[in-house]
Amino acid sequence: AEHGYDAIAIAHHADDSIETFFINLMRGTGLKGLTGIHRVNGKIIRPLLFASRREILDYATAHGIPFREDSSNRSTKYMRNKIRLGIVPILRTINPNFTELMGANISRLTDAQLFIDRCIETIMQQAVTTADGIVTITPQR
C-alpha cells in the first residue's frame, strides 16, 4: 500500500509446498497442515506454485533471466533443507513423478479441507444465532 501495490508476489513453487507438507507432517498436524502453501494468503500471492523449481530454473535459463539462490538453502542445519536435500531426492528415485503426485495429493487434501470448512460454516449459520449480545446454539437433530 505504501508504494501503491495491493499485493506482494512471492516466488514459492511446487517444491516449496511439498517441503511444507513434510515439515507439517513431521511436527504433527491436522488436515489443514497437509494442504501445503496456499496460492493466496491475505495480500501475499504465490503465482508460481504450479511449477517445480526445475521448471522455473529451466525457463529462466532459456530466457536469460538471472536467478539467485540464498546460500542458506545448501545448509542442512534447517529442517526444510534436510527435507529438500535428503528426503525428497530419495522419494524422487522411488517415483520420478513424485512432484506431480504430491501436487495432486496436496490439491485433494486442500479440496477436502475446503469442503469441511464449508460444512462447518453451514452448520454454524443454521445452529448459532446472536440477539442482544446473547449467543444461542441450537443443537441440530
Describe the residue ranges of each PLM region.
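Acidic catalytic cores of enzymes that act on phosphate-bearing nucleotides/polynucleotides
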Residues: Q113-R141
